[in-house]
Amino acid sequence: MEMLTLVRIGRSARLERLLPAALAEFPVTELPAEQIASTAGRRLLFAVAVDAYGPDEAFVRLLRTLRQNPDCLCGCIGGVIVDGAGELDTKQLARQLVLTANLAGCAFPGKPLVEGTGSLYNQHIQA
């Protein structure tokens, strides 16, 4: 089985419980978001935790790095998990990340986005 590279942006208690269970059967290596510029050809899972106030500086730095290095994810295949403390921003931030990573060369096949808002009300909605 091919190695999965986890790119974690932010932390939340719910995401910390979810990731070990979701990734238990996969070989996983974690890559700091600051090192994303040298990631070509990998299978990526972006795990983003957003507090009630919106994206933090690490998320913005990740987007800027991807935009400054337009081919850095060439040959990558990705998926995105966004966990939000509130009801706002999760879908918008996920779309922003997918678009920016796609422009940097990462493919997102199928339905690559899983988002959870604070109340998990949106879990019956497919993005």
Regions found by a protein language model. Name each.
Residues 1-127:
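FMN-binding flavodoxin-like domain, especially the glycine-rich phosphate-binding loop
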